[in-house]
């Protein structure tokens, strides 16, 4: 396929048009008075959203060069969402502001490489001042405020996220699901939960709830399949003498072994239940070891020299209670010591810091949460499917922003933190590097300007008022139109969101500004069918 090449200003101007179009669609969602965007889907109903990254992902421009620019900034929004959980609109608005400011200077003759160096130095200096102004998040109230802001000022969502985080801890897992009704709900599962249910319905003890509930059980952990009863008999006999129930967690329990366990359960000889071990392959072995640490048991594995036939009571774990349904198993109050559990948690955190795979990191985070003792499920209720999707997006954003705030602290919100940090930058630069620094210092005012514009206020007046305030915590409350102490008013942002948004925006804008050529595919010319008129009929045809 043939390709076209365009150079210098022509290339950069085309990319800039694409970036501007994407930004125009995304920026209207910014702030407490931001507007909704209606998106047509190829299937189902259109969706209404105020989530910047959802808007960005839907944009596909017809002009290939413009689309290249839009796609690069789309990537900034997605990367910011992935890394910080929020700040996608901020990153998009910043990238556009930096690129458009820089483009004017480069078109006028500035050296793009020197401009980039100045931009990088300014960005580094701003982040230093931003970090210095941040505060450690402290208590349920701060968490609720961060979550409320990210959920577009929905206090109910903010309070629910704060409650969930209080119950499961900072390392706990909080998931978001759709509720069956219109009311929001919070379910907290205490203890370790994994997604494996009972291997036979005959293990059920509570027929009303269809669950197997076992009090004060022994727990046998094995990383192999159990098919023969002969290997199990020695440990079963020892368990029976204690008159306590037994839970078997193994790769699988099948054939003769499973049928005999069921018969013993039905006859009342032994209160027993069996589930498959969670995960697959090496991850299964790791999760079995997690359960062993939590319950003070030992995994029966040939790799460690243990055999099923040689298992004794000393190898079994313990817990105060276990609840099993057809899909999940919950272990409550395992007998493992807090020191052993903490050592395992620390080991998993080290793995999380060294792995480069996002998937592995996610799975390690799940294991961390299970060991830390809690899983909270926020069930989002709404009257329609469209409202449900929009609300679920907001809850996801708020949850991610809250985790970022807990991780790296908070700064004043509403775009004011960047403006205040920029006012403190005093770099001794000259030439085109100075121009690069000034580009960043002008561009970081864009989020505050956009929030003011969306709320119907004069952007220039608002920025001047915030810059001129003597109290460093003063910012603009776009919901009320007042200048307030942002910390006292609860208008706060996670430092991590501002850091990631500015870093990513500067990075992509720098790349676009130093682009000297763009290559794109030319559309294929469709060949028309040959003209068949004037041809005689074939011989012998009627």
UniProtKB/Swiss-Prot annotation:
Cleaved signal peptide residues: none
Enzyme Commission no: 5.6.1.7
Binding site for ATP: 29-32, 50, 86-90, 414, 477-479, 493
Localization annotation: Cytoplasm
Record keyword Cytoplasm present: yes
One Gene Ontology molecular-function label: ATP binding
Top-level enzyme category: isomerase
Pfam family name, one: Cpn60_TCP1
A GO CC term assigned to this protein in UniProt: cytoplasm
Chief location: cytoplasm
Reactions performed catalytically: ATP + H2O + a folded polypeptide = ADP + phosphate + an unfolded polypeptide
Record's keyword annotation contains GTP-binding: no
Gene Ontology biological process terms in this record: protein refolding
Domain of life: Bacteria
This protein's UniProt keywords: ATP-binding, Chaperone, Cytoplasm, Isomerase, Nucleotide-binding
Purpose of the protein: Together with its co-chaperonin GroES, plays an essential role in assisting protein folding. The GroEL-GroES system forms a nano-cage that allows encapsulation of the non-native substrate proteins and provides a physical environment optimized to promote and accelerate protein folding.
HAMAP family named in the record: CH60
Subunit: Forms a cylinder of 14 subunits composed of two heptameric rings stacked back-to-back. Interacts with the co-chaperonin GroES.
Family membership noted in the UniProt record: Belongs to the chaperonin (HSP60) family.
The protein's name: Chaperonin GroEL
Organism: Sulfurimonas denitrificans (strain ATCC 33889 / DSM 1251) (Thiomicrospira denitrificans (strain ATCC 33889 / DSM 1251))
The encoding gene: groEL
């Amino acid at each position: 396929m043939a390709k076209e090449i365009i150079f210098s200003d022509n290339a950069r101007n085309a990319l800039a048009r694409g970036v501007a179009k994407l930004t125009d669609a995304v920026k209207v969602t910014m702030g407490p008075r931001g507007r909704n965007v209606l998106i047509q889907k190829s299937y189902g109903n259109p969706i209404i959203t105020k989530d910047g990254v959802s808007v960005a992902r839907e944009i596909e421009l017809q002009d290939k060069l413009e689309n290249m620019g839009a796609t690069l900034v789309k990537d900034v929004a997605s990367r910011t969402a992935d890394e910080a959980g929020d700040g996608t609109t901020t990153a998009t608005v910043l990238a556009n502001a930096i690129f458009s400011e820089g483009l004017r200077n480069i078109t006028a003759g500035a050296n793009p490489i020197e401009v980039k160096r100045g931009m990088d130095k300014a960005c580094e200096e701003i982040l230093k001042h931003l970090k210095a102004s941040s505060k450690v998040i402290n208590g349920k109230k701060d968490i609720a405020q961060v979550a409320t802001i990210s959920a577009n000022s929905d206090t109910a969502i903010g309070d629910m996220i704060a409650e969930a985080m209080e119950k499961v801890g900072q390392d706990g897992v909080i998931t978001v699901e759709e509720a069956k009704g219109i009311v929001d709900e919070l379910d907290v599962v205490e203890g370790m939960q994994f997604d494996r249910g009972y291997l036979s319905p005959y293990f059920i003890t509570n027929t009303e709830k269809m669950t197997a509930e076992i009090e004060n059980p022994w727990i046998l952990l094995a990383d192999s399949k159990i098919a023969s009863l002969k290997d199990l008999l020695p440990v079963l006999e020892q368990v029976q003498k204690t008159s306590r129930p037994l839970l078997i967690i193994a790769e699988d329990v099948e054939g003769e072994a499973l049928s005999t366990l069921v018969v013993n359960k039905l006859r009342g000889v032994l209160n027993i239940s069996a589930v498959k071990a969670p995960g697959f392959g090496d991850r299964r072995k790791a999760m079995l070891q997690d359960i062993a640490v939590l319950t003070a048991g030992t995994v029966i594995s040939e790799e460690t020299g243990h055999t099923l036939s040689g298992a004794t009571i000393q190898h079994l774990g313990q817990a105060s209670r276990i609840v099993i349904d057809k899909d999940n198993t919950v272990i409550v109050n395992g007998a493992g010591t807090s020191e052993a559990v903490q050592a395992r948690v620390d080991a998993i955190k080290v793995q999380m810091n060294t792995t480069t795979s996002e998937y592995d990191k996610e799975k390690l985070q799940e294991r961390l949460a299970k060991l830390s003792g809690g899983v909270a499920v926020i069930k989002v209720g709404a009257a329609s499917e469209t409202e449900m999707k929009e609300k679920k997006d907001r809850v996801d954003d708020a949850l991610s922003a809250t985790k970022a705030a807990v991780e790296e602290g908070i700064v004043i919100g509403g775009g004011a933190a960047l403006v205040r940090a920029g006012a403190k930058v005093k770099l001794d630069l000259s030439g085109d590097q100075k121009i690069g620094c000034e580009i960043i210092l002008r561009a970081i005012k864009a989020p505050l300007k956009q929030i003011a514009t969306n709320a119907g206020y004069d952007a220039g007046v608002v920025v001047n008022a915030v810059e001129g305030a003597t109290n460093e915590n003063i910012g603009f409350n776009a919901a009320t139109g007042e200048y307030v102490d942002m910390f006292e008013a609860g208008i706060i942002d996670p430092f991590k969101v501002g850091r990631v948004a500015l870093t990513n925006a500067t990075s992509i804008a720098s790349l676009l500004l130093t682009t000297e050529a763009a290559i794109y595919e030319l559309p294929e010319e469709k060949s028309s069918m040959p003209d068949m008129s004037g041809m005689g009929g074939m011989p012998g045809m009627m």
